[in-house]
Each structure stands twice: as C-alpha cells, then as structure tokens.
UniProtKB/Swiss-Prot annotation:
Gene name as annotated: lprD
Record membrane topology: Lipid-anchor; Single-pass membrane protein
Protein name: Putative lipoprotein LprD
Residues covalently joined to lipid (N-palmitoyl cysteine): 20
Covalent lipid sites (S-diacylglycerol cysteine): 20
Residues that span the membrane, as ranges: 44-64
Superkingdom of origin organism: Bacteria
Length: 126
C-alpha cells in the first residue's frame, strides 16, 4: 500500500453533515423536552441523538483505520473443507420388506380411491 494518506472530502463532508444533523436533532428534542408539552420521550431522544452523532464519527474512524491497514496474508495451509470422518454418519432409512401387509393394504386402498375417482370423473388435477 502507498504511504500517502488519501483525502476524502466528500466522505468527510457527509460524516460532518450527518453528525451535525444528529446534534441538531438532539438540540431540537431537548428544547421540546423543556417546553410545556415536553415528555420524557423527548428527553430520551435528546440523549440518543448525540450518541448517533458519535456513532457516525466512530464508524468513519474505523473505516479509515481499516482502509489504511495492510491486507492480512492468506494462509494457504488452512483446511478448506471438513474431513469426512469428522462428521457423524447420516442415518439411512429402514428398508421396508416388500411383503409388508400394512403397506399392501394401504396401496390397495389408494387403488380403490383412484378407481372411484375415475368412475365419478371427479378429477381435481389437470
């Protein structure tokens, strides 16, 4: 990376406007709290808006620090995939015997329903 610092006038202006806007909204809520119709909700907002302004400045500061730091070296000796013996084996479904009486009875019932449906022409599918 280069050793010269980048100048970001548009970003600095955006952060400054955002922080000043948050402080102005905090001042507005403070004056609303002090008025005759002010509530504790206005006080809460009056205390929150300066925190939002501080958050704008904090995130800009972190952005600049992150951008100026050198990129982290990639470790090529890292494991890129999970070894198959690390995970437990997936359970397999039990095989039904082909002469299962309950399955045979159920299939017969389904065949009767299909036959009745075909006789009555009550098709619900296209």
């Amino acid at each position: 990376m280069s050793t010269t610092r980048r100048r970001r006038p548009a970003l600095v202006a955006l952060v400054t406007i955002a922080a000043c806007g948050c402080l102005a909204l905090g001042w507005w809520q403070w004056t609303r709290f002090q008025s005759a119709s002010g509530t504790f909700q206005n006080l809460g907002y009056a205390l929150q808006w300066p925190l939002f302004a501080g958050f704008c400045l904090y995130t800009y500061h972190n952005f600049v620090r992150y951008e100026e730091s050198p990129p982290q070296p990639r470790h090529m000796n890292c494991i890129a995939e999970i070894p198959p013996e690390l995970l437990p084996a997936r359970p397999k479904p039990e095989q039904q015997p082909p002469d299962d009486p309950a399955l045979r009875k159920y299939n017969t019932y389904l065949a009767e329903l299909a036959k009745q449906d075909a006789e009555n022409h009550n098709r619900t599918t296209t």
